[in-house]
Structures are given as structure tokens and as C-alpha cells.
Amino acid sequence: MPLKVLASLLSFLLLLASCANSDLQRADLATIVKVVDGDTVVVKIQNKIETLRLIGVDTPETVHPTKGVECFGPQASGFTKTVLKPGITVKLLRDIEPRDRYQRLLVYLFLPDGKFFNQMLVEQGFARTLNIAPNSAFSELLASHESSARNRRVGLWLSCER
């Protein structure tokens, strides 16, 4: 097994083990249908089309009806579209609260190689953390990666001064 695949698999298993005592729900496999924006994706899951909202992250807006296009929004959406291509199969983990007020399914998303996509968005500066209880299984991990991205001034932390 190539070293990169083994490392990704080990990372995924460590993430799952770190949440062994949490209230994470079952994992589902889903097929990407389309990307709406940086943190919202449409998938096919169990022969049903669902809109997903990634837990613990908030990318700058590109399609919000009142906020317009925010700084680094197009880049965040572009990154998500590049990684989450239609047709790929991903693994979804749910936390305690299954849906948001817009009835989007709230998930942590893992790529076919085991990489944690929510984390990738934060560590590469495409998203800020957004901790909304009770869905906080990975909040400390994501906060740590946000701090690192800020310190390294990558992505929105370089381009968008608040």
C-alpha cells in the first residue's frame, strides 16, 4: 500500500478514534452531484438527493441572497469544486443535530483517500471555524488548524482583513 494512502487511512482512523466517546452518528457513503458554494454540496445518498452543509466550517459567501460575494468566496467555492468533483464517492459522518434550519444535512465529509475535507478547508485558509453546539465533535481540531492558518497567513487570512 503506498505510503500516502496508508498515512491518510491512519489519519482517518485516528480522527474516528478521537471521537469514540462522542455522539457521532453512523457513516454514510454519498456521491457528489454538485457544489453550491464552499461549504454546501448536493449529493446522492441512498438514492435520494440531499443538500449538505459542512459542520464546523464557514466559507465566505458566493451565492447568499443578502450578503453578496464576500472576500475569498470565489476561491473557496473554486477549491471545493476542484476537490469535490461530480461522481466521486465520499464518506459522511453526522453529529448530534442532523439538520440545520434550512433542512440541509449537517456532516463531516471525508474524501475517498480518507482526508477530512472540513479540516482541509480550514487549514488551507478557505474557511473559518464555526462551532454550533451540539455539533462539536471536531471543534478543537478545526480551531487548531484555523490558528495555524492565521499564523501562516494563508488563504483568506492573507487576502481578507477583518
How should these model regions be labeled?
Residues 2-162:
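Small beta-barrel nucleic-acid-binding modules, primarily SNase/OB-fold domains
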